[in-house]
């Protein structure tokens, strides 16, 4: 009887997970290492080197929302706001359900935040609200410049 109860619990749990859909996070430890390395370059002001790594990440994991967000932050630092907006919009489209553990945050001119993941594959922070904040700040800056 107890064995049957455990089977039912396992089946119910499996169905619940299937209905919830997959929890997306950093794809693997190799990508996480690249995300950490590129963030460190970004924070050190080596934007071209950081951008190159983010582009490599996107070749391996097209649409990676953290890479797209941080590319948007680079474009903010370069005062290329329309490009930043494009990257952030792409990031937001893909950020729903993407979880990470943020280790550090880099402020780009008070307009955009870049995020350094903890060296772990999954986390508990939803990326979407963070990207939405960046998108709102860049849109406000563009609107201000048009005045």
Task: State what each model feature region is.
Residues 70, 104-105, 134:
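Canonical tetratricopeptide repeat
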Residues 30-31, 65-66, 99:
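Helix-start (N-cap) detector for alpha-helical repeat units in TPR-like alpha-solenoids
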